[in-house]
Amino acid sequence: MASSRSSEPQARVRPIETADAGEVLTLQRAAFVSEALIYGGADMPPLTQTLEGLEAELVENLGCVAEVGERIVAAARARLDGELLLIGRIAVAPDMQGSGLGSLILHAVEERGREAGAREAELFTGRLSEANLRLYTREGYRETERAGGEKGEDQIFLRKSLVP
């Protein structure tokens, strides 16, 4: 798969592999620093995850990575829970954010989920993560639940149908 925007570098999307763990962890940490600044602390799973934990997570994962040249510039993980595709840790390199890679990687993961039998996709983000919420809404996701925090609104869960 290649990106279609002419203003962005051509990205090649492929399934995520266990061998990608080191580079994906580096990308994830770089991408989630902005989230840590929004929420006032770095004690969040994308920033504290270990290499060993990520390697274990990538076994039989439906996620994808996007590469420009030899560099992984975007990644997302996903797994099936029945017919529900659970998508997580969407990360785009800070210098590539806003170039369409978030949509590209999200579409690729959704397609892998469809091929594996998913009928619906779910993801979540923090309530203060406005750019994430804009992306997910633009891509057809709708809020289904708020959870966590004193007022139950720290995390926003969103879903999208994957079938016509």
Indicate where each model-derived feature is located.
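A short beta-loop-alpha structural element at the N-terminal edge
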Residues: 11-26
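Conserved GNAT-fold acetyl-CoA-binding loop/helix
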Residues: 26-54
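A short helix-loop-beta-strand connector motif used in the catalytic cores of GNAT acetyltransferases and
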Residues: 53-65, 86
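A short, internal acetyl-CoA/4′-phosphopantetheine-binding micro-motif in the GNAT/acyltransferase core
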Residues: 65, 90-97, 125-127
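Conserved beta-strand in the GNAT
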Residues: 65, 71-79, 86-91
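Conserved acetyl-CoA-binding loop-helix of GNAT-fold acetyltransferases
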Residues: 92, 98-111, 134-138
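Conserved GNAT acetyl-CoA-binding A-motif
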Residues: 113-125
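Conserved beta-strand-loop-alpha-helix junction that forms the acyl-donor binding cleft
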Residues: 123-133, 149-154
